[in-house]
Every structure is written in C-alpha cells, then in structure tokens.
Amino acid sequence: MPQDQHLGVDKAKILIEALPYIQRFSGKTLVVKYGGNAMTDPELESSFARDIVLLKTVGLNPIVVHGGGPQVDSFLKQLGRESDRIDGMRVTDEATMEVVEMVLGGSVNKSIVNLINKHGGRAIGLTGQDGNLLRARKLLMEKQEEDGSIKHIDLGMVGEVTGVKTDVLEMFTQSDFIPVIAPLGVDEKGNTYNINADLVAGKVAEALGAEKLILLTNISGVLDENKNLLTGLTTQEVDRLIETGVIYGGMIPKVGCALDAVKGGVVSAHIVDGRVPHATLLEIFTDHGVGTLISNRTQTTH
C-alpha cells in the first residue's frame, strides 16, 4: 500500500475511534478552563481554538473559562507595580482590580474570542458582570497557624462564586455561540471581584449539570507516589490520596475543584496536560486520553 494510503487509513482509524464518543456526547455541555502554557504558546493557542470549534461542529456545547495571571503580571510590571500573593492567591486592591478587569475582561478575553472565530467558530466574550452571570462575594482565605488556630486573611477584591445565571449561557449555546468567560464576578452591591478561574469553571459546570469539566494545566495529571500518571480515579480514591499526602501542595486546590464539581453533579472532571497539542480532543475522543479523569464511578476509558 502506498505511503499516502497508509496515512489515510491511520486517519480513518482515528475518526472511527472518535465516533462512539461523538455519538455519546452529542448535545452535551462541557466546560473547559483554559490557562497555563496553552495560553502563551502560539501553536497551542491555535490547536486549542481548533479543538473548541470542532467540538461545537460535531454537536457538543463547549463553554470556555479562561485565566490570565501572567498577562496581568506583565501589565502591572509595565506600570511599575507588583501584586503580592498568598498561597498562590493574588492580593487584589482597588488599583490592581482595575488592571485585572482591563486585562482579563478586555485584551485576554477578546484575543481568545478572535482566535476561535478565526478558526470558524462563533465565540462571544463575557465576564461575570454581563447579565449578572457570576454572582460573587468576598473571599476570606483561611490559614492554619502553628498552634492549630485558623487565621482569616483579607485578599482584597478576591471573591468566590455564589451563583451562576445559567439562562444567560443557555441562550448563547442554543444559538450556536461559544461563550468565553473571564473570571470576574459581581455582588449585590455591584462590587466586582477577581475569582480563581478553576473555581469559576467548576461552579459553571455544576450549575449547568455539565457532562464534563476539563482543566487544562501545565502538568500531565494526577500522579501516584511513584510519579506515574493516574488516568482514572473515583471521588473516594481522590479523597484517600489527599488524606495520605500523595496529592499535596499546589495540586490540592486544582484536584479539589474537580472533586467538588463531580460531587456537585458534573459527570466527570478531567485534569489535562495543556502542553500537549489538541489535548482537549485527545482527552474526550480517545480511549486513554491525556490526563486524569475523576468521576463517581470507576472508568477505564474517557
């Protein structure tokens, strides 16, 4: 068989492998948190946008929630300013909040929208302020002191999601738009808050009863004590890995977000290596995926 026919057969096999997943997930909603290297590497940016457009084209309803911490840091540096962080959370005063709103709700959001549209999609940019999409309240971080007492730390204009206006999102997805959400929420008094994008994605997925929550990261997924990738975990197994210290440090918030989403009704959550081109498609439409799947039941395929 000529080489070009071999390549054609290989491509056909890939499509056949994807077919049952396309059929199973047609009409389903998935929420993708977009951040990390996938937002800063031009090749990965392009592959992500094409993945999202393909998902919409084959009948799924993707919703994108994006981060943008490095872009905010870069803009603050240009202004000769820095913002402190406590356990990875940005301390956000009013002046910093103005920059966060401008960068996340402006340049970063519009860049993602334009990229998806460039590849044939119909993306529409939103923040949590639009239509009161994301209701929020001030977040007080809890930190345990050496004596065991709990200290509450004020991070400024940092918030947590208290509600999601699902009708706003459903209006757009039912009209074949792809919502792209900046992680900014608003309280009843009109105060705007900077919210962790992972947490926003998880709450949006919960509120919509999404089929999948996909968190694109700069790691391969959840690793065991020997640093081997765990491709499938139940919520009970995740709880045990946290209790035994296998999951620790900076992974706990991300895994906790996925865990909360599944316990809140999302069918499965995926922690995926966003450094891999087309990671979103590979995780959804192939048998083994490229990350860790977390669900309420044991699964060997994605």
Swiss-Prot record:
Site (Transition state stabilizer): residue numbering on this chain: 33, 254
GO molecular function: acetylglutamate kinase activity; ATP binding
Gene Ontology cellular component list: cytoplasm
Annotated compartments: Cytoplasm
Gene3D superfamilies (UniProt xref): Acetylglutamate kinase-like
Domain of life: Bacteria
UniProt binding sites for substrate: 68-69, 90, 194
InterPro entries xref list: AceGlu_kinase-like_sf (IPR036393), AcgluKinase_fam (IPR004662), ArgB (IPR037528), Asp/Glu/Uridylate_kinase (IPR001048), NAGK-C (IPR041727)
Function: Catalyzes the ATP-dependent phosphorylation of N-acetyl-L-glutamate.
Entries under HAMAP family matching the protein: ArgB
Xref: NCBIfam families: argB
The protein's name: Acetylglutamate kinase
